[in-house]
């Protein structure tokens, strides 16, 4: 399961730290909603490592499959949650009805249809003649919470793990993929003030922005780290990057970590025909 963030306030805080992620919440049965994605926010593994190593996040590891967790909690608390939701809906609808009726009375007073001497029976007749009750019922809405009531009950396995254990588990995925140095590329770019996002659609590991992606264009497509002293550049990958990068005016950036000095170095390839 990829790293996920479900809380809106946490997502706002992450953006201040230069981590934007990708919104992935959608309605599977309503394809038109895919344009307006919502929580959870899916992070890259590098984002989680950076947050964890800088003491900016409390990482919770869930070993069970999500479907099994949800099924167990739903069976255990389904009836209770249903009652809570219905009670909250009824209270919300009651408040909305009162607010709409008070608003309607204020408008009638403003245009002179009623005054302080108008009786409740007269007001009721006015409501019936104008179908006001039907209009109020049709305007009621359901307020959807930003956080899940069920996710709070998920029991994580990280309570018994030390900070070093969590770091080892996070780095283990990198060691298995043989791309341990890629995180050091990520860290070096973050240290230089870049904001990084997944770069798969442009043929890279990351795309790098000089600031907030809503304000700046990305000119860099970052590739996986390589041992540039001994490992050749994959020409097929470079050609693919050229085809994708030329259209959107992006440099093709490769880099790696020098074994002797442990310094991170970057090299860029700019395509002819920009503009």
From Swiss-Prot:
It is a peripheral membrane protein. The active site is at residues 209, 217, 250. GO terms for biological process: tRNA-type intron splice site recognition and cleavage. Heterotetramer composed of SEN2, SEN15, SEN34 and SEN54. Interacts directly with SEN15. Coiled coil: none annotated. It comes from the Eukaryota. GO terms for molecular function: lyase activity; nucleic acid binding; tRNA-intron endonuclease activity. The gene is SEN34. This is tRNA-splicing endonuclease subunit SEN34. The tRNA splicing endonuclease complex is present with 100 molecules/cell. It is found in: Nucleus; Endomembrane system; Mitochondrion outer membrane. The keyword Mitochondrion applies. InterPro entries: tRNA_endonuc-like_dom_sf, tRNA_intron_Endo_cat-like_sf, tRNA_intron_Endonuc_cat-like, tRNA_splic, tRNA_splic_SEN34.
């Amino acid at each position: 399961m990829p790293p996920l963030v479900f809380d809106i306030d946490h997502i706002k805080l992450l953006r201040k730290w230069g981590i934007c992620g990708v919104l992935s919440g959608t309605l599977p049965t309503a394809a038109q909603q895919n344009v307006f994605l919502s929580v959870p926010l899916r992070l890259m593994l590098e984002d989680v490592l950076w947050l964890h190593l800088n003491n900016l996040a409390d990482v919770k590891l869930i070993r069970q499959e999500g479907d099994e967790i949800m099924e167990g909690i739903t069976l255990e608390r389904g009836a209770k949650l249903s009652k809570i939701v219905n009670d909250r809906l009824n209270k919300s609808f009651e408040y909305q009805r009162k607010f709409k009726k008070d608003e309607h009375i204020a408008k009638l007073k403003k245009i002179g249809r009623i005054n302080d001497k108008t009786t409740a029976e007269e007001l009721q007749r006015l409501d019936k003649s104008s179908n006001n009750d039907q209009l109020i019922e049709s305007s009621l809405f359901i307020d959807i919470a930003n956080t899940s009531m069920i996710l709070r009950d998920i029991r994580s396995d990280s309570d018994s793990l030390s900070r070093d254990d969590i770091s080892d588990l996070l780095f283990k995925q990198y060691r298995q993929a043989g791309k341990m140095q890629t995180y050091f590329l990520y860290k070096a770019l973050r240290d230089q003030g870049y904001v990084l996002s997944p770069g798969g659609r442009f043929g890279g590991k990351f795309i790098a922005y000089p600031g907030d992606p809503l304000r700046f264009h990305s000119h860099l497509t970052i590739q996986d780290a390589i041992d540039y002293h001994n490992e050749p550049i994959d020409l097929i990958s470079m050609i693919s990057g050229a085809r994708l990068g030329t259209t959107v005016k992006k440099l093709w950036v490769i880099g790696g970590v020098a074994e002797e000095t442990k310094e991170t170095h970057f090299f860029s390839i700019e395509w002819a025909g920009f503009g």
